[in-house]
Regions:
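Amide-forming acyltransferase catalytic core, primarily the GNAT-like/NAT-type
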Residues: 1-89, 99
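A structural signal for short coil/turn segments at secondary-structure junctions
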Residues: 59, 112-113
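Conserved acetyl-CoA-binding loop-helix of GNAT-fold acetyltransferases
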Residues: 97-110, 130
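Active-site/acyl-donor-binding loops of N-acyltransferases
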Residues: 1-16, 82, 92-94, 118-167
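Short active-site oxyanion
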Residues: 24, 114-118
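Residue-level signal for alpha-helical context at structural boundaries
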Residues: 54-58, 108, 123-126
Length: 167
């Protein structure tokens, strides 16, 4: 799968482009990890509970992870980010749809006030990519995923990253 690496300069006053979807977006908790693992396994075929716990525990104070649920409480996606002087990046995450991914991205972008984080969308996520462009995002690179063994095509939106991942 090919991914568009994009960056967006977030204004000092914040990012205020919310996507309406009737979703609840909140900070992830350790109690969400099991559902996050199940969702990512279904969407992308990998499991990394250890990473999710590390991000949510946030002992270094640089990680932020959100979950997105529907009105029934079903987990539809999650998205993490790192905000450190050496790396300002959004991901990893997965979403059931482009709309879910965009809602989580919009929420995380506001936490990067006055900064310029990088995030990745699959090149096939046309609505998400076009929406990011409309917000002022720009391309910086293209990346390709690879795997050993049999490939499992994603069953949703995957937003990878270059952070410490065990997947």
């Amino acid at each position: 799968q090919a991914f568009q690496d994009m960056y967006l300069e977030v204004p000092e006053e914040g990012f205020h482009n919310e996507i309406s979807g009737g979703f609840e977006i909140r900070k992830a908790q350790l109690s969400d990890v099991e559902e996050m693992v199940v969702l990512e396994k279904r969407i992308s075929g990998i499991e990394r509970a250890k990473d999710f716990k590390y991000f949510i525990e946030n002992k270094r104070g640089i990680w932020n992870t959100l979950v997105c649920r529907d009105t029934n409480g079903t987990l539809l996606g999650f998205l993490g980010s790192v905000d450190h002087p050496a790396s300002q990046m959004i991901g990893p995450g997965v979403g059931e749809s482009e709309k879910v991914a965009l809602c989580m991205l919009a929420s995380l972008l506001d936490r990067f006030r006055g900064k310029c984080p990088v995030f990745l969308f699959p090149v096939t996520a046309k609505e998400a990519v076009q929406t990011a462009y409309s917000w002022g995002a720009r391309n910086c690179e293209i990346h390709f995923s690879q795997c050993l063994g049999k490939n499992q095509p994603p069953k949703g939106i995957v937003m990878p990253t270059f952070m410490p991942e065990t997947g």
